[in-house]
Each structure stands twice: as structure tokens, then as C-alpha cells.
Amino acid sequence: LMEYLLKNTTDKKERAYLLNHYLDSFKGTVYRQTQFAEYEMLTNKMYEDGESLTADNLSSVYLELNKKYYGSDIISDEHIAYEWARIPHFYYNFYVYQYATSYCAAFSVAHKILEEGTPAVERYKKFLSGGCSMAPVELLKIAGVNLETPAPIQDALNAFGEIIKEMETLVED
């Protein structure tokens, strides 16, 4: 849908809005959920290593990850360190990475459909008809997406980079 909307808009402001929405969706699903998954991994390792899981320790880890993920160009308000305490994803064990991988898999399927047409649509239908007959990673292979390789994630990240470049060009004009 996003590709269709971008292809068919001639209004610069609408295009900027669509690109921003695309980027924000990508950032929130791929980068932020990966950040959350890394936070869970690090805090679980702290526990396994016998470290105390105090609010100060958990907040410190979260703040450092926030700085890592947002980079030095973004000023991190020190209060962001406490955000971990209000994120419901952390009430249940490690699963948020699936948001990022699923987004990249869906991105890959959609782009295969746009590039290949009918053959990719047929593979997608076969994937859908597979239901729960096998593991999701195996079902995705039917659709032409192999999450056991870095390709789907790298392709999505490359596209994200291109969308950023387009947005930068658009706002410079």
C-alpha cells in the first residue's frame, strides 16, 4: 500500500508525510523492538551472572542502550533511563525480536510481489495456505524469504536507507 501511495502522489507535502510515516513505522518496529530485545538479553545476562537487578542497574543499562541506538546526534534526556519500567513487553519473556524479523519478512514478501508479480503472489498464497503446518521460518521459505540468512533484514535496512535519502532530498528542495 505504501509503495502504491508513494508512486501515485504528486504533492510534495503528502509525499513527505508518507515517507515520514514509513520511516517512523520502520524505526518503531525494527529498531526499537531490536533495542528492547537487546535490553532483555543484557538484563537476563546480568541475572545469570549474579548481578543485582535493581532499578538503578536496569535504568543504567536502558540509558546506555538508548544512547547506542539513537546515536550521539540525539540528546538523551536522563529520564529516558526509566522508560523500561513502563514497557509492557517486558512483563512477558523474550519475544519482541519477532516484531523486527516479521516486519523485515513482510517487507521482503511485499517487494518480491512488486518485483516478480504473479509467481511471488502464488508463493505467498502457498505460504498462507500452509497455516501452522510447519515452523514459521520454514513456511516463509515457501514465500521466498529465508530468515536463516541476513538477506531479508539487510534488504529492509537498505530500503530504509534509501527512504531516508529520499526524505533528505525532499526536505532540502
PLM segments and residue spans:
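C-terminal, non-catalytic "cap/extension" segments appended to globular domains
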Residues: 1-13, 37, 44-173
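Short beta-alpha connecting loops at secondary-structure transitions
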Residues: 18-25, 46
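Hydrophobic transmembrane alpha-helical segments of multi-pass transport and channel proteins
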Residues: 26-30, 93
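Core active-site phosphate/anionic-ligand binding loop and the adjoining beta-turn-alpha structural block
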Residues: 31-39
